[in-house]
Amino acid sequence: MNEPSTSPEWNKTRITASLGIEYPIIQGPLGGLSTQRLTATVSNFGGLGSFGAHGWTPAAIKDVIAEIRTLTAKPFAMNLWVSMEDEGAHTSGSEAFARSLSFLSGHIQALGGALPAFTPYVPIKFEDQARVLLDAKVPAFSFIYGIPPKEILDECRAQGILTIGAATTADEAIVLEQAGVDVIAASGFEAGGHRGSFLRPAEESLTGTFSLVPQVVDAVSAPVVAAGGIADARGMVAAFALGAEGVQIGSAFLACEESGASLHHRKALLSGNTLRTGLTRGFTGRLARGIHNQLLEELNRQGVEILPYPLQRGLVRNLAIPAEKAAKPELLPLWAGQSASLCRHTDAKELLQTLMSEVSSIAGPVLQWNREGGGK
């Protein structure tokens, strides 16, 4: 391995100081593909492991936090979605359900799956989930799709819980900082899965990471994490050169066997330069990036009726379960960012070791140039 650069220390930023971690690298929260094992592996290495808990009940979140704490004594983050549902989720009825199901029913039946029946939407409240995080005094609380209520942010501050809010535009970053959020995650449109736009529709908030990061760095005084399209040391160093004080990596960790991704999903992520991604509302009802496959293409066709989030997500699960059993990845929602073709590692610790070694050999001069005002 290359010897780390010593002047300046690239891994010493406000983010590492605030959290007491060794490296300014955050494992992206992977929603339903999160695992306690991956979260702990990243944290034990010296980064910030994250667990995406937005789809979990408060009781289940409490159990997840307890298990993570049996696996690591290091800081970790729990991630929630502030906006848990789209307009119409409560009023969408059986007729809309039947129309949306009609675009999937042929595949479900061909795979031997049972067609689901309509059931009214029963919400999980963000405030109830957040209460569990507050009571557990988690080290870091990250969130997307908006800003938590003031009383929640005030309690985080009082308890020393670091808050990390996602911004997909510079104006979102500004309002997050004005609300007292500690760290801004500047999430470019290259990112896999959901990005969490909240001031404007997601389709109007498609700035790329390496355009967004310097805009956000210039707009706020809070430390900025670069997220989206970063999968190797080159992306990390580029983010540091643009003023980021940390990076968030998703797809590269998703490809590791510690993640909750299926074998078919991980194989697709490791397929190399042939991998292509696209944006769709068809997988969940909210705009998100995944691997371009038959399912994504069919659900993006004109005339396909998409239910509001999270109803569409629940509907698609009725296809995903039999498709997984039948080894039909072309009919699975496969989350991935635009740099997923750079995924090379199947072991999270090996990925981290490679990133740290490669970044250490080149980041010092770049960071010094940036701290001295380079590029401005």
Task: Show where each model-derived region lies.
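Conserved active-site-proximal phosphate/metal-binding subdomains
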Residues: H194-L199, E203-V225, I230-K376
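Active-site entrance/lid segments in N-terminal catalytic domains of soluble metabolic enzymes
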Residues: N2-A219, L355
